[in-house]
Amino acid sequence: FPKDGRPQPAELVPQLNGEHITIAERMKEAGYASAFLGKWHVAPSSGKGGKVDDAVSPNGQGFDLNVGGTSYGGPPSFFSPYRNAELEDGPKGEYLPDRLVEETIDFIDANKGKPWMAHLWFYTVHWPMQAPEPLLRKYADRKGPGLNDTRYGAMIEAMDLAIGRVLSALEKKKNDKDTLVIFTSDNGGFAGVSDCRPLRESKGHLYEGGI
């Protein structure tokens, strides 16, 4: 807040532009193969299934492989059919985080012995609130402080298990000692289904709870 107590709007950059240099472009210069898997959401839709213009797609921004990267902030469905222009449907009922992990491991296998970088940006946690039935049952009676919607907990555990599969694959391939794994988030907790207290506010705000 400024001294007059009036909040000022933050500048909004609606999409990547040509002058923006991505880490994928820099890593390509260094000889790395790169893959983007999951939520792109930095360019407007220009076609069916969330498709974006090539120049502002993951491929246009330096990534060699794009799996599921579209204009979507949240997927039409976390279960196949996905209705995603950059992701072929899997078997009916396939869960999106599991599919993205399979694609990630396939990319790692395809680049064995080479330097590589994978950006695995799960759509989790986002609307629609969907998780595998066994996890929904597990969390069905676990409402309480910080968990206002039990589906939220189920989705987080599903993502946690998916990440564990990537780490296990790296260990099995003996790449776990020379691979840098960064786990981070793009925003705070989701208001309505979670509770960020004692931090103020939640996703969509510039207070601590939102970042």
Predicted segment positions?
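Formylglycine-dependent sulfatase
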Residues: F1-I211
